[in-house]
Amino acid sequence: MIQKRTLWVAIPFVMMAAVMTGCSDDSDAPYTTDPVVLELTRSEKELVNQSNEFAFNLFRKIIPVPNSWSDPMPQNAIISPLSITYALGMLNNGAAGETQEQINKVLGFGNYGTDSINAFCVKMMRTAPQLDPQTKVMIANNIYLNKSYKLIPEFVQKAKTFYDATPETRDFADGKTENVINQWASDHTERMIQKVFKDGQFMPDAVSYLLNAIYFKGMWASPFEVQNTKDELFGTTTTMPMMHQTNTFGYTETTDCQVLQMPYGNGSFAMTIFLPKDYNPFQEIPTAEEWQQVNRAIRTTMVDVKLPRFETTTDTYLNYVMSEMGMPDAFDSEKANFSNFCYTPTYIGLMKQVAKIKLDEKGTEAAAVTVIDMNLTAIEPTPSQIVEFHANRPFLYVISEQQSGAVFFIGKYVGE
């Protein structure tokens, strides 16, 4: 039997920052301009919908809804499903057979070939940074290759063409590569994520590390005034700084929750917050179809908003979750088929993501790093009056691109 080697596919992070842009103008007034049109074909729109289905399914697996008060309660969490999509999309060019089919199915791309997925990824990577001159968006990919191994030329070409990732060959045993990868992560997240690996996670005998970074920096289209932030009760026992403003925002309601949509910059990106109408740790995660329904139902409404200022960091181990979602072969040293990736048989030994978010009066800053270790081998009408949206209890939030509806980040905040 051929022993398969470890391939670390590191998707180091996805970074989002919605803060004041680095310019000399001290004014808090947002600079706005009309959004660039993101033109998607019918099949590309379907790819977005399927990708969002993966996003919500993934978060549902990571943050399971408790069945009773005796079950573990949800914790603060944030993930970037889009980062995982890019990392696995790039790696899937090296997969074959059942392994490739399973990855495609989990990502929601089962009816599409890798060429369609590659074309969609490169289109989003090229277009997203152009949607709003006030908002900085970067999507970057990279590959570090152990000098002891060689990649399949066709995979290398696709990585360059569709993901702007050119393999860099290094001696993984030189004691420097881990720091090089960490520095790359730091450079592409404005230092939000400076360490990709926990102690002992970097493997000198790994075949390769594949990395993806998504960075977003902007500001609320309607910032909060710092002087209006007051300490108030969050939940039943915790006091937190609560930001406050009354303004027009996107708003709707479902039977169980209020939904607020707050735009960044010129409105190309927004945060959508799902707030249960009562304190409810059993809040369900929406499906992609429900996400579409909510976006169609949202109307501009005058809303009195209270939102906590918070920061959350999540380090999520993804091997078990992704295997449970339907791609077990990729993690199995005997079944994995990445014959189009490397001349040496490989499998995924570790897949993880580190994510971080900061939310304050100016906007939102977030980052996520995903690491995959491959081893060898019904909506109600919107009220017309001023609506109270006081997020003083656990809530779900989604950061998305508005024209396509593509989900960049999903998080849950339950308090400190």
Regions found by a protein language model. Give the residues of each.
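Exposed beta-sheet edge/beta-hairpin loop segments within beta-rich domains
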Residues: 200-201, 384-391
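C-terminal or internal capping secondary-structure element at the end of a domain, subdomain, or sheet
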Residues: 393-416
